[in-house]
Amino acid sequence: MKPKPSDVTPKELFDQRRSFLKLGAASVVATGSVSNLLAALKTKAPSPLSFIPSENLENLKPNSFEQASGYVNFYEFSTSKTAPVGLSKTLRPYPWELLASGEVENPQSLSIDELYQFPLEERIYRFRCVEGWSMVVPWIGFPLSALLERLKPTTKARYVKFTTLLDPTQFPDQKRGALGVIPHPYVEGLRLDEAMHPLTLLAVGMYGEKLPAQNGAPLRLIVPWKYGFKSIKSIAKIELTQEEPLNTWKLLNPREYGFYANVNPEVDHPRWSQASERLLGSLLKQKTLKFNGYEKEVASLYAGMDLKRDF
């Protein structure tokens, strides 16, 4: 059931509700009054993000914020999973402009403040990295389709190309030019029907807050049925194209990384199995689900395709 507009919870009230549940009983028992509890809630700085909370119909248990924000791939900063937390302080997510162009009738340049005005909702999604680890994250954002509908794709548009900001003053690896870990700027792409799918999200926040720098602030893509490298971070450009974009990892190694990158336990990476994954915080591995558990929703997009060839 889709929440009503009246169900939209301002971020500060959302936080207060969670804080009340966590602190209320203990505070009342310890002090015999609610005054200390109310004082504690007032110390929480309000956020401008308002969003529809997730109904979490799958009863997914999110990883902790510390796990999801402290273990990331962001090669513009480092190949280390933990170093971007500190190194990403050079990123300036505000002000920010998104240039949307290409095969559209209504090209636009949108500020991050304008993007915050889209109806935001919380989506609790599984996230599966091609490297074999996974997590569950409560993202905040809006369907990419909402932006694309505003742009009005032409009949020539078949793909959507995404590009990370190119600014060596903010991203250390971009200073290295041809010696960088990857060619810059980072590029990803989707077929137009994939981009228009209701699960495809442009995320501006997570865990009730704006995106941390190391998680791709201020704007990133989330495609939950694909491996994580498709979910490009710090997006500066969106372009609708006639031709399939050459995404960064396919450019680097087309034998190991394809354009589609659908999560598929039946198609191994050339150097490791994709049949299982390690959930962050767990010592044991779990079976990987086809399309990361979203097979019912997205399998029809690939009807008749050879998923071992088109990986």
UniProtKB/Swiss-Prot annotation:
Q: List the molecular function annotations (GO) for this entry.
A: metal ion binding; molybdopterin cofactor binding; oxidoreductase activity, acting on a sulfur group of donors, quinone or similar compound as acceptor
EC number(s) stated in the UniProt entry for this protein: 1.8.5.-
- Where in or outside the cell is it found? Periplasm
List this protein's GO terms for biological process: protein repair
**Which InterPro entries does this one have?**
MsrP (IPR022867), OxRdtase_Mopterin-bd_dom (IPR000572), OxRdtase_Mopterin-bd_sf (IPR036374)
* Gene Ontology CC: one annotated term: periplasmic space
Q: Which domain of life is it from?
A: Bacteria
Q: Does the keyword Metal-binding apply?
A: yes
Cofactor(s) annotated in UniProt: Mo-molybdopterin
Q: Which N-terminal stretch is annotated as signal sequence?
A: 1-45
Which of this chain's residues are annotated to bind Mo-molybdopterin?
75-76, 129, 164, 215, 220, 231-233
UniProt cofactor note: Binds 1 Mo-molybdopterin (Mo-MPT) cofactor per subunit.
The enzyme's first-digit EC class, named in words, is oxidoreductase
Q: Catalysed reaction per UniProt?
A: L-methionyl-[protein] + a quinone + H2O = L-methionyl-(S)-S-oxide-[protein] + a quinol; L-methionyl-[protein] + a quinone + H2O = L-methionyl-(R)-S-oxide-[protein] + a quinol
Keywords from the UniProt entry:
Metal-binding, Molybdenum, Oxidoreductase, Periplasm, Signal
Q: What is its main location?
A: periplasm
Task: Tell me how the protein is altered or processed after translation.
Answer: Predicted to be exported by the Tat system. The position of the signal peptide cleavage has not been experimentally proven.
> Can you state the subunit structure given in the record?
Heterodimer of a catalytic subunit (MsrP) and a heme-binding subunit (MsrQ).
> What functional role does this protein have?
Part of the MsrPQ system that repairs oxidized periplasmic proteins containing methionine sulfoxide residues (Met-O), using respiratory chain electrons. Thus protects these proteins from oxidative-stress damage caused by reactive species of oxygen and chlorine generated by the host defense mechanisms. MsrPQ is essential for the maintenance of envelope integrity under bleach stress, rescuing a wide series of structurally unrelated periplasmic proteins from methionine oxidation.
Output the HAMAP family linked to this UniProt entry.
MsrP
Concerning PANTHER family, the annotation shows:
PROTEIN-METHIONINE-SULFOXIDE REDUCTASE (PTHR43032), PROTEIN-METHIONINE-SULFOXIDE REDUCTASE CATALYTIC SUBUNIT MSRP (PTHR43032:SF3)
Give the family per the record. Belongs to the MsrP family.
State what protein this is by name: Protein-methionine-sulfoxide reductase catalytic subunit MsrP
Which organism encodes this protein? Wolinella succinogenes (strain ATCC 29543 / DSM 1740 / CCUG 13145 / JCM 31913 / LMG 7466 / NCTC 11488 / FDC 602W)
What gene does this protein come from? msrP
